[in-house]
């Protein structure tokens, strides 16, 4: 099963709110998710508080082969999780990553 980490739109008209979910890549955007791993609120003016990522769960799914969509990748870059994943792919341990 090919899994993706992507955004699921919820919220009302003109007030978008997104959940960051793990989903089978063949399902529709708002289909049933395997797991919810965060949320994103683009309306929030404070860029530091407009998203939450469960970093440990996202890294676990990435290790299992899940693919990340571009919008979620941008959120991961903003939080530093994309760099952490890059270091993990190079074979560094958790202690070495924390020092970097």
Regions inferred by a protein language model and the residue ranges of each:
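Structured, basic alpha/beta domains of bacterial-type, RNA-associated proteins
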Residues: 2-100
């Amino acid at each position: 099963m090919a899994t993706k980490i992507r955004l699921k739109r919820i919220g009302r008209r003109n007030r978008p709110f997104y959940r960051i979910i793990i989903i089978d890549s063949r399902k529709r955007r708002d289909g049933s998710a395997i797991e919810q791993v965060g949320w994103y609120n683009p309306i929030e003016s404070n860029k530091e508080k407009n998203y939450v990522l469960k970093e440990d769960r996202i890294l676990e799914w990435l290790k299992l082969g899940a693919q990340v969509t571009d919008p979620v990748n941008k959120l991961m870059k903003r939080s530093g999780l994309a760099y952490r994943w890059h270091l993990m792919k190079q074979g560094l341990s958790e202690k070495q990553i924390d020092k970097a």
